[in-house]
């Protein structure tokens, strides 16, 4: 038998998989005094939604396998090849190419920002809800060769298809 209402609420929240909701007392303390029930419920649901979104973002970022985090705000656009405009890079960062089922291949000399841009676009894609898998070209080539030799190319293909974007920097 459960003793208190608080314990019952926490148990039900656990069963319903609403972990943030279980911290209702903290959320209620922060709410406006005299708020009606629908306002309180809305605050609880918004807190639960925000926590879930944050957890999903954290999982996507971890699964992407970025070696480090970089943003376009940190990028020195003077490194770019003169034929590539900063506006074009910002357009890529909108991630519209993913919805359009287009690929991006970045080729160039070392130190020109290909990896930085790939990671920055990948981070943006993760935060927009896309699954991303980051592989540099050398690692991807090695994995494909090893999978081919082990007759497991299908496994690699499924892994790549599962993700909305493959950034090879």
Question: Positions of the model-derived regions?
Answer:
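N-terminal pre-P-loop "Q-motif" helix
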Residues: 75-91
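Short hinge/gating elements
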Residues: 24-28, 74, 103
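Conserved P-loop
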Residues: 86-163
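Conserved AAA+/SF3 P-loop NTPase catalytic/coupling segment centered on the Walker-B
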Residues: 165-169
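Alpha-helix C-capping/helix-to-loop hinge sites
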Residues: 27-31, 78, 147
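Intrinsically disordered, low-complexity and often Lys/Arg-enriched segments
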Residues: 1-8
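Interdomain "pre-motor" coupling segment immediately N-terminal to P-loop NTPase/helicase cores
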Residues: 14-69
């Amino acid at each position: 038998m459960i003793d208190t209402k608080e314990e019952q609420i926490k148990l039900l929240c656990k069963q319903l998989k609403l972990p943030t909701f279980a911290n209702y007392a903290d959320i209620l303390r922060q709410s406006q005094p005299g708020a009606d029930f629908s306002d309180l419920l809305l605050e609880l649901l918004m807190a639960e939604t925000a926590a879930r979104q944050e957890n999903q973002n954290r999982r996507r970022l971890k699964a992407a396998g970025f070696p480090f985090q970089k943003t376009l705000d940190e990028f020195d656009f003077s490194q770019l090849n003169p034929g590539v405009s900063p506006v074009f890079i910002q357009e890529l960062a909108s991630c519209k190419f993913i919805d359009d089922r287009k690929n991006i291949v970045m080729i160039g000399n070392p130190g020109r920002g290909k990896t930085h841009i790939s990671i920055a676009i990948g981070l943006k894609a993760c935060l927009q809800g896309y699954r991303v898998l980051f592989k540099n070209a050398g690692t991807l080539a090695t994995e494909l060769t090893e999978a081919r030799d082990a007759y497991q190319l299908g496994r690699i293909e499924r892994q790549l298809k599962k993700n909305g974007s493959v950034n090879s920097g």
